[in-house]
Design a protein with these regions (language model features):
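ATP-dependent carboxylate activation and anion-phosphoryl transfer catalytic cores
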Residues: 3, 9, 22, 27, ...
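N-terminal low-complexity segments that are often proline-rich with Ser/Thr-Pro
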Residues: 407-431, 525
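Short, basic interhelical loop/turn and adjoining N-cap
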Residues: 460-469, 527-546
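Intrinsic disorder and flexible/low-complexity segments
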Residues: 513, 517-518, 523, 527-528, ...
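ATP-binding N-terminal substructure of ATP-dependent carboxylate-amine bond-forming enzymes
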Residues: 1-133, 145-148, 389, 533-535, ...
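Acidic/histidine-enriched active-site and ligand-binding environments that engage anionic O-linkages
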Residues: 152-161
């Protein structure tokens, strides 16, 4: 009988490991408390929610390292330990305690996913062997322990290759190498983080897809959420704009990847929650499994908030031995947790970078994380969600369009010119579009505004044409609003009654409504109408708001209920939208 549980917390905040693990740890502690279990937390970071009074029964502000944890286990004698709620640090610490024999010495039961399953997913060589047993495709790779082995592996696989460090978080030490010089430099960095390095054949340009899968001890499995990265493979998922649910997968692609994710979680024997990342060839249904995280991850926190399904809470209960069918859905309070959420909205996660604060850091994005945080936006359309998200980042942007110049001028190849020819570009687009930077989304906006085709931008960025079509739709609405710039001029001279006659002119009110539906703020609309030339922009935004209210163009409050309104929701989880 489990009466006392030790939870390894999220530890210090660092790039790649931030508030997401505080969120999952807090949820797990609440789940244990509900069961009347005494909880002990180890977390050196005092500025977290999980270390607040009343969340855990006892808190140790000690580093999440095997030596310190062993002393606390010897003193507290817990019955069980949870490893998957503190990110990579907690997972590595748990594996070390297991290998040292500390857990068996003090008779501490690992709750949820067995340690061997964690080792199978973290050790790159073992991981590939385990997936080969069930005929699941992985990226062609070789595990190496020396720089000499890395060089030999790269020669065998053929360039370009990607290097990945084992047991590392946030793509630490990973990078793409096109030649031997880059390889040796990257290998040196990777070995400084980990004793084992994986050399993989590069699949740059493939789509990156993620599934969040939950399994209980009775072998019941569900996929809670699937997500798609706007950027193709080659940019770390923590650096990319992520959309949930996926938007560009066909029905057969979606179900094929879902079935494989469930097959993997069953074969490895994970109990609780795990994250499966895929590379998918945009030209066929060919796929590769990139990695499996046998823990709550950044993506889990996003999936949890995006769907309203409390992943960490459920995972903690499953670790105690419950089945999915025995747990209540915390949103509806009537259905069980054994269901797959249905979403009638779109969620966008957008990273935030603060690269100006770090001296000498390249603005180029790659397979290693640089972002320091992220925002999540909810809308009824992709356009609305991405515009809301870009406003929320807090870096002075007003949305996808309507910003002052954010990138250097772009010179793209003209029709008929070869997209890969270096002669077609000046220096700026190489950094803006060909090589992704933290402002690439605004470089895409600028290229669309300059009249370049979706196909040209797709060739440069490898962003899916569906996303580019939606982004072009935002630019088209902005252009349509600019055709009504005479309204801002007339507003200076005309009294309200006469002005309203012009506002009511054919097509404008429909356009105003469409702009709001697709995520335009009053500020963006005022800027597109040219109010900036004549008025303070704060006042101009209020003018647009006044017009909207006059013609009843107002937002609705929508509820996130996990079941697309099939059952009434008891939880107040809300968002505003114009449809």
């Amino acid at each position: 009988m489990i009466k006392k549980v030790l939870l390894l917390g999220s530890g210090a905040l660092k790039i790649g490991q931030a508030g997401e693990f505080d969120y999952s740890g807090s949820q797990a502690l609440k789940a244990l408390k509900e069961e009347g279990i005494e909880t002990i937390l180890i977390n050196p970071n005092i500025a977290t929610v999980q270390t607040s009074s009343g969340i855990a029964d006892k808190v140790y502000f000690q580093p999440v390292q095997a030596d310190f944890v062993e002393r606390i286990i010897a003193k507290e004698r817990p019955d069980g330990i949870l490893l998957s709620f503190g990110g990579q640090t907690a997972l590595n610490c748990g594996v070390e305690l297991y290998q040292r024999g500390v857990l068996s010495k003090y008779n501490v039961q690992v709750m949820g996913t067995p340690v061997q399953a964690i080792i199978d997913t973290e050790d790159r060589d073992l991981f590939v062997k385990r997936l080969n047993e069930i005929d699941v495709k992985t990226i062609k790779s070789e595990a190496c322990n020396t720089v000499k082995e890395v060089k030999q592996a790269a020669d065998d696989l053929g360039y370009p290759v990607i290097l990945r460090a084992a047991y590392a978080l946030g793509g630490l030490g990973s990078g793409f190498c096109d030649n031997e010089e880059q390889l040796l430099k990257q290998a040196e960095e990777a070995f400084s983080f980990s004793p084992q390095v994986l050399v993989e054949k590069s699949l740059k340009g493939w789509k990156e897809i993620e599934y969040e899968v939950v399994r209980d001890k009775y072998d019941n499995c569900i996929t809670v959420c699937n997500m798609e990265n706007l950027d193709p493979l080659g940019i770390h998922t923590g650096e990319s704009i992520v959309v949930a649910p996926s938007q560009t997968l066909s029905n057969s692609e979606y179900h094929k990847l879902r079935a494989i994710a469930i097959k993997i979680i069953r074969h490895i024997g994970i109990v609780g929650e795990c994250n499966v990342q895929y590379a998918l060839d945009p030209e066929s249904e060919d796929y590769r499994v990139i990695e499996v995280n046998a823990r709550l991850s950044r993506s889990s926190a996003l999936a949890s908030k995006a769907t309203g399904y409390p992943l960490a809470f459920v995972a903690a209960k499953l670790g105690l031995g419950y089945g999915l069918f025995e747990l209540k859905n915390s949103v509806t309070k009537t259905t069980t947790a054994f269901f797959e959420p249905a979403l009638d909205y779109v969620v966008c996660k957008i990273p935030r970078w603060d690269l100006t604060k770090f001296q000498g850091v390249s603005h180029q994005l790659g397979s290693s994380m640089k972002s320091v945080g992220e925002v999540m936006a909810i809308g009824r359309t992709f356009e609305e969600a991405i515009q809301k998200g870009l406003r929320m980042i807090g870096q002075g942007m007003h949305g996808f369009v309507g910003n002052h110049e954010t990138t250097p001028p772009i010179t793209l190849p003209r029709e008929g010119e070869e997209a890969s020819s270096p002669v077609s570009y000046q220096l700026s687009p190489v950094t803006s579009l060909l090589s992704p930077t933290d402002t690439r989304i605004f470089a895409v906006a600028q290229a669309l505004q300059m009249g370049y085709t979706i196909e040209q931008i797709h060739q440069l960025t490898m962003i899916d044409r569906w996303f580019l079509q939606k982004l072009k739709h935002i630019v088209d609405i902005n252009h349509a609003l600019q055709q009504y710039s005479h309204l801002s001029e007339l507003y200076q001279f005309l009294p309200k009654s006469e002005m309203m006659e012009y506002v009511e002119e054919e097509g404008f009110l429909t356009l105003l409504y469409d702009a709001k539906v697709y995520g335009f703020s009053d500020f963006q609309i005022a800027r597109a109408l040219g109010f900036e030339q004549y008025f303070n922009m704060e006042k101009a935004g209020l003018v647009i708001r006044q017009w909207r209210k006059e013609y009843n163009i107002l937002p609705f409050v929508n509820q996130i209920d996990t079941l697309a309104a099939e059952y009434p929701a008891q939880t107040n989880y809300l968002y505003l939208s114009y449809t």
